[in-house]
Amino acid sequence: MAASTLPSGLSTNDLIRRTANPHPNVWGYDLLCSLKSPYSRDSSYKERADTLINEIKAMLGAAFGDGKEMITPSAYDTAWVARIPSIDGSSGSARPQFPQTVDWILKNQLKDGSWGTESHFLLSEPLLATISCVLALFKWQVGDLQVERGIEFLKSSLEKIKNESDQDSLVTDFEIIFPSMLREAQSLHLGLPYDLPYIQLLQTKRQERLANLSREKIHGGILQLSSLEGIEDMVEWERLMDLQSLDGSFLSSPASTAFVFIHTGDLKCLAFLNSVLAKFGAFVPCLYHVDLLERLLIVDNIERLGIDRHFEKEINEALDYVYRYWSNERGIGWGRMNATADLETTALGFRLLRLHRYHVSPVVFKKFKDADGEFLSSIGQFNKDVASMLNLYRACELAFPGENILDEAKGFTAKYLREALEKTETFSSWNIKRNLSQEIKYALKTSWHASIPRVEAKRYCQVYRPDYARLDKSVYKLHHVNNEKILELAKLDFNIIQSILQEEMKNVTSWFRDSGLPLFSFARQRPLEFYFLITAGTYEPRYAKCRLLFTKVACVETVLDDMYDTYGTLDELKLFTQAVRRWDPSLTENLPDYMKRCYKIFYDIVHEAAWEAEKEQGRELVSFLRKAWEDFVLSYHEEAEWLSAEYVPGFDEYIKNGITSIGQRVLLLSGLLVMDGQLLSQKALEKIDYPERSRVLMEQICLISRLADDTQSYKAEKARGELASGIECYMKDHPECTEEEALNHIYGIMEVTAKELTKEYLKVDDDDVPFACKKMLFEETRVTMVIFKDGDRLSNSKLEMKDHFKECLIEPLPL
């Protein structure tokens, strides 16, 4: 008999009371006591982490300066530069303009006769690089032995390919460029197997690509600039020069730029090539400059690995640099000099800049739509397209209300990525090495708004590859982006933080055992689940007090929740509520012992939270927090009265009460006000807290949490006789709608609220509220969305939740 008036002649001991604790706590105290992490005892780990931080800071200083970009050589591009004849009229054209590049080719042939990336895993890359080097050496009639060995490599490799299925992933525009170079080799009578079925297939594919490639697309600034050397017959040179970048290059490609110079003699092209060789010496990379892409990739990696707090200055400098070249009309390319924008770089830039509260507009993505409304990076460049679409999909998750183009792009990219997963050729050895399929599956399965930051950091540590290579016309590496030091620091940092959190968990468990809360056997006892709820997003050591107080308040809240929902009678609850409103413990004298104990614990935790808040904030906050708790308890009492009367309110009435009864406001305020070093003025509190203003951060958090809870728990609650839920109340207002339609309506509200919450969180020029405070609120909400993703995992600790807990707090990363 729950929340009802006590019948005459029946004592409280005679009542048959329900409980809300169907499952015991799955985390044993003995397990926690057994945790003895070496990372908390051995100071050498912390010393090594500090050393790595300093070394990486120095590395980033070099990367973000105007020095040499750490990018691997491209034999393919170097060979194109080597083909440029001397511009010195006195010597004719019988010698190269850049003889050092010819020497580099002669010295860098691999043991198997190829050129390209050593230990290559894509056959298309050495094929393209080798034919390029062979043609360059043959042009200058040098390196006969190298030419012979190169031709033998080409012959043996091509003869092994019986059909298209034998060919792995293709470097960018391979089917455009390689047949063109084969045609040149044939005109020079180089002994290659030109009649092989695979060669004929490539020729056919090239013709199909070119048939769909109009001259307008070539000269329109969108497509094929990176493969000019493969479409010589279609180029209109005067129109093409309009697409030249400020640094003289064409899409930062030394090969394409060398090709244009050979045909036009353009001095800006020559100046670009001179500048690249001045940087790198005897070789050129496949792309230069890549200063915007490199900075964005570094920031993205550091943040996804969970070590960004160590590099805040460097991250801000990198993003300030990128933003100087950002255009909401055209986006950005790989480098600051690019005349043509790139979808991957633009999408990555949009996401990171928005996350750091720069003003960026989604209008930028209109440029990447074709006449059919599809979003493109380059037609036929499938590997590149997948990466671009994944970055665009992630960018779309940061949509604000009314940004329809992001909704459109998200739908398009989700469909594209699902289809990509079904195509086996998408995930050949190239993309398997990138772990691209895992990234796509995770992105499609896990919404950014419902994800666990600490789990994501650990999993990214597990897939991050220091030897990661990117794919263009060559396989290339950006050494500042992926390297051993960054990964070592990320793993060390994760384990060191985990060891700190394990000690905190022991303190939480000890507090809980001594608090008296375990005596309330009718209530859910989830101290470690609540600790996980805050810690999975706010894990920094300095916020230990925030985590502890959040957990304590959550434990007390849950006892109150279960007492009002299931265990207490209405008469008891009225007296308890009155005692809360008057803050008078003497009013509990006529209540059962369990309620007296409950009130004392409640009273003590409220004032502990207030006193800790006052110490941190330096002003009186007891009355503020008391009022918040009063509102919270009154909302519980309202629901108890509904239950007793079997009353189902209308949707608006339910939501008005439900955003308070969900408990997020009291919970988050308690942790928020004790965050180390984060002072919240009255003005800042009013910007966060919904009793003062509507549609602010706290109200949005409470609304989306309430609805998420309802969508997962309403069936179980209805079975227990609790009739009021968002779904039932909406159906009361709309008798004609089905349960499924009501659920869809609720999901629609949640989607809109998530966008409003994102906008409030990432609001530009909102300096009154410390961003660390906003982040704590937002990250806790993300974890809450995971809790209610497939059922109420706080009430029923499911296996997946247990796995998340172990990932974050129990199992270290192997070094």
Swiss-Prot record:
Keyword line: Cytoplasm, Lyase, Magnesium, Manganese, Metal-binding
Induction: Up-regulated by methyl jasmonate.
InterPro entries attached to this UniProt entry: Isoprenoid_synthase_dom_sf, Terpene_cyclase-like_1_C, Terpene_cyclase_plant_C1, Terpene_synth_N, Terpene_synth_N_sf, Terpene_synthase-like, Terpene_synthase_metal-bd, Terpenoid_cyclase/PrenylTrfase
Cofactors, names only: Mg(2+); Mn(2+)
Residues binding Mg(2+) 1: 561, 565
Gene: TPS3
Disulfide bond residue pairs: none
Residues involved in Mg(2+) 3 binding: 709, 717
Motif DDXXD motif, chain ranges: 561-565
Top-level EC class: lyase
Catalytic activity, as annotated: (2E,6E)-farnesyl diphosphate = (E)-gamma-bisabolene + diphosphate
Sequence positions that bind Mg(2+) 2: 561, 565
Stretches of the chain forming a coiled coil according to its record: none
Name this polypeptide is given: (E)-gamma-bisabolene synthase
GO-annotated molecular function: magnesium ion binding; terpene synthase activity
Chief place where the protein resides: cytoplasm
EC number per UniProt: 4.2.3.59
GO cellular-component term (any): cytoplasm
The protein's role, per its UniProt record: Involved in defensive oleoresin formation in conifers in response to insect attack or other injury. Involved in sesquiterpene (C15) olefins biosynthesis. Produces mainly (E)-gamma-bisabolene when used with farnesyl diphosphate as substrate. No activity with geranyl diphosphate or geranylgeranyl diphosphate.
Record-linked Pfam families: Terpene_synth, Terpene_synth_C
